[in-house]
Amino acid sequence: ILTGVYEMADMHDVDYVLLLTNNRDQEKKSLSQYCLENNISGLVLHGFSTADPYLLELATLKIPNLLIDIHPEAADSYGIAVNNEVAAYQATEFLISRGHRAIAMISGKSWAQVSKDRESGYQKCMADHHLPTFIYEGLFSEEYSEELVKDILSDHPEITALFCASDLMAIGAVKGIQAMNLNVPQDISVIGFDDIAIAKYVTPSLTTIKQDMHEIGRRSCEILLEILDKGQIDQKQFYVKHSLIERESVSSR
């Protein structure tokens, strides 16, 4: 994302400032203070929870801002992401098309908008096919998901496929499945989300939803510059294309 933002900012000869923040920093200084001290005219925000104090401050900030992976609510806020709900629906539909009927989802952190959107897509697809849902919180953690999947499959041996809301959780799940002396994909199929660089190199290589993070960063800066130039624009939510990358971690039943 950052390289995409920097690339577009450099192209338009725009100065940019990177702020890495946490709860302790936010207690010391408000977002409005930071923007005032650094003469900020526009913001691109990423990695915040939906209840983050900085996000809540946007309603009164009156500075154009673009939120990555969060739905815009404030008057001066705009949003950009892949359509996470549609992409999750597509991933689940892909597993169903391969004959799977008992499909569990390992979601991310409950406070993350992407987790909520991807859960919604999974739930809608399963409901459309009149299938039961199994949703577990994997915290976007490879290690946690590796242990979690053992509990999932022990409690629900009927499950034949997993949709994981990130590739890291999918890789952890594969390790956990293999530790149970089960085979991926012959026994359990796994599909991830992101298409991180390592996804094609793990064994088996990971079937996943690809989102172009560089393009999200580039478009974020491009849209923000357009907003700053025009004052405001009518469109509030923007989407970057995603695609399903089929590799070796899913098989037919």
Where are these regions (language model features)?
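Central regulatory/effector-binding core of bacterial HTH transcription factors
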Residues: 6-51
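Short, well-ordered alpha-helical microsegments
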Residues: 28, 51-54, 170-173
